[in-house]
C-alpha cells in the first residue's frame, strides 16, 4: 500500500523521476477507453503532458482497498484547464505491485472527460 501512496504523491507533484523508480521496468499501463497497454516511458510522457495541461492537479481518494497482489482504488482527478475551466475525472484503478514496484495498472475512466483533457493538452501544444 505504501508504494501506491508514494505513487499518487509523485503524480500530484509531477515528479517523473520518482514515478519512473516506482514503476517496474517492464510495467504496463492499460486504459479502458483505448485498450492499449502502454510501456512505462510512453505513460510518463502522457503524465508529463497532463501536468503541463492541468494546474492544481490532485487526486481525491474515494476508497483504496488492498488486493492479494496490489491495490484497488477509486478516485477523482481534479484540477484546472488552461482556459480556467475546472476538470473532474472519476476513475477506478487496479495497481498490481510486486517487490515494492508497480508492475501493471488497469485504469477505468470516463473517456469523454479524458478526451477533454487531451484536447486541452493538444491545443496548448499547438497540435490537432
Give each language-model segment a name.
Residues 3-10, 17-20, 35, 88, ...:
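Generic alpha-helical hydrophobic packing signal
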Residues 45-128:
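A beta-strand edge to alpha-helix "cap/lid" segment located at domain peripheries
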Residues 1-25, 119-128:
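Short, low-complexity N-terminal intrinsically disordered segments enriched in polar/charged residues
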Residues 16-20, 24-68:
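A solvent-exposed, acidic/Ser-Thr-rich amphipathic alpha-helical stretch
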Residues 1-7, 30-34, 49-52, 74, ...:
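Short, mixed-charge, low-aromatic patches
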